């Protein structure tokens, strides 16, 4: 005989069902990548499709799933629909999920070494060390992400230097300081590639593993172009 659940029990199970809506929306590698990209800046569907190397149709479907779970929001700008994270806590959720995976799954480090095969070639520096170095003007901070992501928010004092611009703009960088590169975070190779190029030009280079999401989670503020006006 099936026992009838009390109203209290039904409400409790309903709560867990609602919590599971969030985990279900995140239980897809493509949607996790979209979250990671939206931490950097708001993007259109076409932009996200290009960055994630997916079709526009598939990207749109994944975004709709995230939207139903209220993890992303969208608004129309001209002819485009622009997506962004619904709450800063979502960035923190992704960062902590990634850290749990790194702690619990030995395969993460193995695959990370295959993906970022230069990641052990440069000295690591923490967000706290970067913040301290900026206060006494000891480091030159290079943002290796695309310029639109830099404009959406970057580490204080950082210079926008996308990897594909380094060769033609290297003369803009002063010598005499330690260069620190960063990009979207640990699951991104842009800062590694920038470090290789800058090192070849004779600059002492360190790599910040954190991106803008981790920087904010550490308690530090971002800077935007309008902040300097």
Segments and roles (model prediction):
Residues 1-18, 92-137, 143, 225:
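Amphipathic alpha-helical dimerization/coiled-coil segments
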Residues 18-57, 81-88:
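N-terminal helix-turn-helix DNA-binding core of bacterial DNA-binding proteins
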Residues 63-64, 212:
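Short, hydrophobic-biased segments on the C-terminal half of alpha helices
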Residues 67-77, 84:
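Beta-hairpin "wing" of winged helix-turn-helix
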Residues 67-68, 151, 217:
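The C-terminal cap of the DNA-recognition helix in HTH/winged-HTH DNA-binding domains
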Residues 74, 222-223:
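Short beta-strand "wing" residues that participate in macromolecule-binding interfaces
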Residues 129-193, 225:
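Positively charged, proline/Ser/Thr-rich regional signature most characteristic
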């Amino acid at each position: 005989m099936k026992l009838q659940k009390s109203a209290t029990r039904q409400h409790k199970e309903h709560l867990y069902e609602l919590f599971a809506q969030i985990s279900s929306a995140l239980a897809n590698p493509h949607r996790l990548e979209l979250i990671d990209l939206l931490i950097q800046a708001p993007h259109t569907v076409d932009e996200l499709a290009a960055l994630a190397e997916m079709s526009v149709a598939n990207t749109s479907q994944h975004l709709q799933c995230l939207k139903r779970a209220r993890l992303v929001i969208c608004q129309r700008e001209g002819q485009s629909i622009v997506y962004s994270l619904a709450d800063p806590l979502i960035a923190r959720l992704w960062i902590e999920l990634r850290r749990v995976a790194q702690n619990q799954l030995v395969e993460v480090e193995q695959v990370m070494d295959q993906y970022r095969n230069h990641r052990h070639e440069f000295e690591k520096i923490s967000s706290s060390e970067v913040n301290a170095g900026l206060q006494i003007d000891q480091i030159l901070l290079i943002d290796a992400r695309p310029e639109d992501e830099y404009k959406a928010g970057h580490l204080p004092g950082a210079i926008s230097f996308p990897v594909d611009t380094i060769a033609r703009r290297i003369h803009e960088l002063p010598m005499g300081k330690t260069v620190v590169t960063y990009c979207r975070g640990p699951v991104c190779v842009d800062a590694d590639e920038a470090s290789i190029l800058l090192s070849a030009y004779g600059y002492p280079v360190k790599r910040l593993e954190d991106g803008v999401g981790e920087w904010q989670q550490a308690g530090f503020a971002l800077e935007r172009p309008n902040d300097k006006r």
